[in-house]
Swiss-Prot record:
Interacts with SERPINA5. One of its GO terms (molecular function) is protease binding. Residues 291-310, 334-344, 412-425, 455-464, 530-545, 558-581 have a biased composition (Basic and acidic residues). GO terms for cellular component: extracellular exosome. Residues 24-62, 132-157, 173-194, 271-581 are annotated as: Disordered. Residues 138-157, 174-194, 324-333, 366-396, 481-497, 505-529 have a biased composition (Polar residues). Residues 1-23 form the signal peptide. This is Semenogelin-2. PANTHER family: SEMENOGELIN-2, SEMENOGELIN/SEMINAL VESICLE SECRETORY PROTEIN. Its main location: secreted. Keywords: Repeat, Secreted, Signal.
Length: 581
């Protein structure tokens, strides 16, 4: 009697293996539902469990081992069960690898199958053990829903009385029941019970995380990657693609506790610029990008804005300014005072948005925080009156510290603050040069120059982008050269302004000095750094003007500037210091 039972059992095992390998749909109709659990021990004739359908996976670099265990349809504690089940996950993967390697040992109450799936989705949701002979369509393999893997519906429906239907060649699973009691329980239930899937870390999928970060726009593997870094098992009854849909439209997903924001759109970067206006250092995303946006906006000088991280050069805008009248130039610089963090754009978009905001471009400057380029307005501004110039300077008074992008991004936003570009020089810390404004201001009347300088006094420390970037803080204050060039060591750019000053009359330079001086007297607050700036201005600026400009006018200008440095630089430093600190 015993030998007959063994023979029948071995025969059933052979039939089941053939059904699993060939994908037949009727391999186990004649077998008893408890045949897999009656004689689990001591039978070497049952070595077929060890071979376990070694079909090679054609999926990309990974196979999913699904530890399945049975849960009621109405069971709300499956998360708790999944956590309990998680303790044995690593041990089961080891066993599964051993048996997939061809070991002939019998695993008690466990059945494994390697995928024969050609699907690109590496994670397969679960078959339903349905007593009625039909499988739920809701929890089938998402790869089947995508049409990428062979369907296992008919197979699972015919294997409904046994747990060997887990061998369905569309689904790679490992029976998670640690005892025959679960099998008996599953078979005893007339209701459909869901087989939850617990996914485990695969060495190849940690690589997929890197690939998904590189792709940044492809979220097919986001769920797998996210769950694998957290080393958690997926126990949701929902198909995997639903989780992808939840996370797909969002650019933010956590990997290893890091918040990765993938905003490639300029509109998103515009929002970041707005956030900077509120004091958010959103551009601080990667200090490594370190935009050295050197904008030497002198009339003839093309601003080679080197976004070193992105290597784009915005020479065009400066050329446009060449044909503009001096009045326009000053206006444009005032617009910059309004807080052209636009040039900062967003290092992500890496487009150097140079906004030569000509006279009255207040509205443009508001949009400037959004990274829009206001080059068009400059041409329109050509016909504008000097009164418009003063207006944008007032707008700057509102305190656009926008240029203060993020010292980490170290984008040197040069703000061509027209008259009294003290604030620009403050922002010079990122190497932005306010030479342009000085040149522009030359053609303007002393009144106009003084007005924007006062606006700057209102605290355009916006240019004060990031002291870390250590961009040369060359502040070539327009007339009178209040050039409190703190970072004189970095003042390689000051040549331009001096040359431009050569064509200017000496009378113009002292007058704007007075204007700026009068405007700054009322607003000076703290002169902590006055001594340093005076020394730098007195020595370095003189040397620069003498070397950089061969004309005698430049020398005269420096003399006037040096005469007033004591009084002007103190006030100017006082204006900068409270804001910078």
């Amino acid at each position: 009697m015993k030998s007959i039972i063994l023979f029948v059992l071995s025969l059933l095992l052979i039939l089941e293996k053939q059904a699993a390998v060939m994908g037949q749909k009727g391999g186990s109709k004649g077998q008893s539902p408890s045949g897999s659990s009656q004689f689990p021990h001591g039978q070497k004739g049952q070595h077929y469990f060890g071979q376990k359908d070694q079909q090679h996976t054609k999926s990309k670099g990974s196979f999913s081992i699904q530890h399945t265990y049975h849960v009621d349809v109405n069971d709300h504690d499956r998360t708790r069960e999944s956590q309990q089940y998680d303790l044995n996950a690593l041990h089961k993967t080891r066993k599964s690898k051993q048996h997939l390697g061809g070991s002939q040992e019998l695993l008690n109450y466990k059945q494994e199958g390697r995928d024969h799936d050609k699907s690109k989705g590496h994670f397969h949701m679960i078959v339903i053990h349905h007593k009625g002979g039909k499988a739920h369509r809701g929890t089938q393999n998402p790869s089947q829903d995508q049409g990428n893997s062979p369907s296992g519906r008919g197979i699972s429906s015919q294997y409904s009385n046994t747990e060997k239907r887990l061998w369905v060649h569309g689904l790679s699973k490992e029976q998670a029941s640690a005892s025959g009691a679960q099998k008996g329980r599953t078979q005893g239930r007339s209701q459909s019970s869901y087989v939850l899937q617990t996914e485990e870390l695969v060495a190849n999928k940690q690589r997929e995380t890197q690939n998904s970060h590189q792709n940044k726009g492809h979220y097919q593997n986001v769920v797998e990657v996210r769950e694998k870094h957290s080393s958690k098992l997926q126990t949701s009854l929902r198909p995997a693609y639903q989780d992808r849909l939840q996370h797909g439209p969002k650019d933010i997903f956590t990997t290893q506790g890091e918040l990765l924001v993938y905003d490639k759109n300029q509109h998103q970067t515009k929002n970041l610029n707005q956030d900077q206006e509120h004091g958010r250092k959103a551009h601080k995303i990667s200090y490594q990008s370190s935009h050295t946006e050197e904008r030497q906006l002198n009339h003839g000088e093309k601003s080679v804005q080197k976004d070193i991280s992105k290597g784009r050069i915005s020479i065009q805008t400066e050329e446009k300014i060449h044909g503009k009248s001096q009045n326009q130039v000053t206006i444009h610089s005032q617009d910059q005072e309004h807080g052209h963090k636009e040039n900062k754009m967003s290092y992500q978009s890496s487009s150097t948005e140079e906004r030569h905001l000509n006279c009255g471009e207040k509205g443009i400057q508001k949009s400037v925080s959004k990274g829009s380029i206001s080059i068009q307005t400059e041409e329109q501004i050509h016909g504008k009156s000097q009164n418009q110039v003063r207006i944008p300077s007032q707008a700057q008074e509102y305190g656009h510290k926008e240029n203060k992008i993020s010292y980490q991004s170290s984008s040197t936003e040069e703000r061509r603050l027209n008259s009294g570009e003290k604030d620009i020089q403050k922002g010079v810390s990122k190497g932005s040069i306010s030479i342009q404004t000085e040149e522009k201001i030359h053609g303007k009347s002393q009144d106009q120059v003084t007005i924007p300088s006062q606006d700057q006094e209102h605290g355009h420390k916006e240019n004060k982008m990031s002291y870390q970037s250590s961009s040369t803080e060359e502040r070539r204050l327009n007339y009178g050269g209040k050039n409190t060039q703190k970072d004189v060591s970095q003042s390689s750019i000051s040549f331009q302004t001096e040359k431009l000053v050569e064509g200017k009359s000496q009378i113009q330079t002292p007058n704007p000095n007075q204007d700026q001086w009068s405007g700054q007297n009322a607003k000076g607050k703290s002169g902590q750094s006055a001594d340093r700036e005076q020394d730098l201005l007195s020595h370095e600026q003189k040397g620069r003007y003498q070397q950089e400009s061969s004309a005698a006018r430049n020398i005269v200008i420096t003399e006037h500037e040096v005469a007033r440095d004591d009084h002007l630089t103190q006030q100017y430093n006082e204006d900068r210091n409270p804001i910078s600190t």
